[in-house]
């Protein structure tokens, strides 16, 4: 997976993400603002902003927020959102999550929501967050997670490892720019190994209707059929994690999101 593939994939489907209810109004968005308790003087950065929904949610509560992304089409959507909401303190910047073009210790808050599963090098990304945060600054992360003992108890480590591999394959078939979802425990380890104090973590279930989810990135009929079979015929551990079921004749499943709030020591 290359960053150019991420740009190609999301550039082609920027409009779909601008209107996606999961990204624009998902439960994790309001919860993130609630947990962070942003200050009115704060300088904030949203990494991999996509259509700008997270930056826009924080903008009314901070002095300034930069919505950054590696994809120009997404930044255009973020600018449209800021204009529509009258957010004069929200601006955009082209930025690679693993090589941020900002000086050390610039921000009071760095956010990143439903994006790190596209990043090739998660420790590099977290290290960049550490670098650009002020001492005492807050790192607020949301991302889809893979099954592990914290999210899916009652299975062996081998069963969970296999389920995580299959789940990531499931995501990659639908979206070739997908890199890897981590488990909750792995996220916690990387964040604390970087030097952060982990202040809070929780999981949120995100109910997804299969067909719109599969179609959002333009999957063809054969790919959708393959994904449907993987979801319906998965191992017990994968089924316990994704919880596929029929609702009014339509296939639904549940993705788990991790919310992690960490602080850079003073």
Question: What are these language model-derived features?
Answer:
Residues 1-42, 53-57, 74-77, 138-172, 212-214, ...:
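Conserved class I S-adenosyl-L-methionine
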Residues 51, 185-188, 194-266:
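Conserved Class I S-adenosyl-L-methionine
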Residues 111:
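A conserved beta-strand element that flanks and buttresses the S-adenosyl-L-methionine
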Residues 123-138:
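A short glycine-rich, Lys/Arg-flanked "PGG" loop and its adjoining helix->strand segment in the class I
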Residues 45-99, 124:
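Class I SAM-dependent methyltransferase SAM/SAH-binding core
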Residues 117-118:
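A short His-aromatic
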